[in-house]
Amino acid sequence: MLRASILRARPAVRPLARAARPQWHVAQRFYVDDKKNLGETAVPNPAPTTQPSSSPSNPTPVQENTIPASEVPKGPPAPDSTIGASRDAPTTQPSTTPPTGTGTASVAPDPIKPLPKKKRRRFRRFLLWLTILSGLGYAGGVWYSLVSDNFHDFFTEYIPYGEDAVAYFEEREFRRRFPGRAGEPRLHPQISGENKVTIPGRSGLTARPAKENSSDLASRGPHVSAVDDNKKQDKTESGGQQPKVSSQTPVAKEQPVQATETASSKAITPLDHLNVPSATEPVVQDVVKIVNDIITVVNADNAHDGKYNSALDKAKSELTKVVSDINAMKETLEQQAEAKVKAAHAEFDQAAKELIQRLDHQMQAQETQFKEEFENERERLSQSYKERLQSELQAAQKVYEQSLKNRLLEQSIKMQKSFTATVRERVEAEREGRLGKLNELSSSVHELEKLTAEWNSVVDANLKTQHLVVAVEAVKSALETQVVPKPFVTELAALKEIAADDPVVSAAIASINPAAYQRGIPSSALLIDRFRRVAGEVRKAALLPEDAGMASHLASLAMSKVLFKKSGLAVGADVEAVLARTEVLLEEGDLDAAAREMNGLQGWAKVLSKDWLSECRRVLEVKQALDVIATEARLNSLLID
């Protein structure tokens, strides 16, 4: 968005720039306002003064110098003389001043010269990029030489200083991998001035006697010593040239080899395989064998004259050093292996701990899931068992009623049978008495009919009483099991329908406040909870008189915070004692006595507890009515004869 706005604004800026460009040139011509030295005469277009600089890229600043009038040249320099001036060295032009006295120099403004175009530093950029790319290519070649063997051969053979660069990085890699041997020289240290011995490649491989007139280790020659023997040369062969003798090396005189010298030379003792430290290593045994072979060959040479004793002693010491290096390397490798094993053990322990933690988390999650499933299953089973219990209770009720009917039916059948038997006996007796006792028989029949009618009324009364008791218990159960107040119109209507013509039951139901069974009444727990909240408010107003104002309310509220709360069956008529006794009575279940205690309050305490007393009154009315109905049912069951 920003680029688009800049691009759209460029065409509008160009006309303004064209219009302002002449103004810039005019502003450059206002040179008359500058301060000038009237005692000096300036020449227009003076020759540019340049100062040589050591490097073209860092020009030195040029200080302005005022040219005296005596040193001013007669004419301006040619235009071509300023072409070769260095662009990096700035030129200074003195300010133009009007002539003083009888001068011939004309004062005129300098013509405006176009700004010189900046030279493109193509060659310098080319050299810079060439250097950067060459360095990157060289570095990439060194890196790839360390990776690829084929490119390594090509790079070290055809690229200048490629072998040195690759060797440097290989040496760094070797020092990084083997830090213990990084400081040790790989080659035998050479001592300046010592006699150097050149040993052929195949010398000492076989132990055979030396042959005469043959090039071997036993014969003296260039391979024995690097110092050339200064032998005398014949004048005929040298052509008049004298042999050159080195000033540093003395002339060695040839002496014949004698048998006494070979006998006097001490034989070199070979190495013992068992005395060498770490002799059990196969590599050490091979090296000891090679050194012993060399010692055997040297001892077989009778002309060695102890020349190789120092070299072989040094070889023995170097062997000991190599063995110590091998032992150190083994110890280092063992330590590294032990460290790796410990790291692996630590890693395995960490992995095992993480696995145990994951298993613990999984077990906890599974345990939580099982608990949830168990709770859900328990709730489901509880609900199913409740439904099953309800259905079984209903079935048991029906079975009980049916069994009662069956018993009554059996009893009536038995009575009819007994009546029939009695009639038969009577008939037989009458037959025997030839209708002598017809009057007695008719009276007995009337008594039996009366007894049957009475039994039917007893059965009906028992059923009615039982239904009434069940209805009363249903209402009580609904009131006791409710969590929040619920209407019990249905249960009360069923109770009234069962009671039908009973005036006592109808009067008891009529005495209940309609708001009680339409809205419901609170349970004992709700009344206790409501009482505790009301008791807090009553305590705040315990010290208030009947005509209390705002200040009295605030004072009573403040004093209620410091009053001691009584507990138990406290003695006294004060508010705190009444509240304590009421709370104890409520906890004991004596709602009537608790309501009587609260009803004895006076003033604001009674006003605040008025709603709670009305709820207690409705609860007591309902309980009293239910108790009356239950008592009436028991009385009816007792009055049946």
Curated annotation (Swiss-Prot):
TM regions (residue ranges): 126-146
Keyword terms, alphabetized: Coiled coil, Membrane, Mitochondrion, Mitochondrion inner membrane, Transit peptide, Transmembrane, Transmembrane helix
Composition skew (Basic and acidic residues), residue ranges: 226-237
Transmembrane is among the record's keywords: yes
Pfam annotation, one family: Mitofilin
Recorded coiled-coil stretches: 311-408
Transit peptide stretch: 1-16
UniProt keyword Membrane, yes or no: yes
InterPro entries: MIC60 (IPR019133)
Mitochondrial matrix side: 17-125
Membrane association type: Single-pass membrane protein
A GO biological-process term: cristae formation
GO CC term (a single one): MICOS complex
Polar residues: compositionally biased ranges: 238-250, 257-266
Subunit structure: Component of the mitochondrial contact site and cristae organizing system (MICOS) complex.
Name this polypeptide is given: MICOS complex subunit MIC60
Organism: Pyrenophora tritici-repentis (strain Pt-1C-BFP)
Annotated gene: MIC60
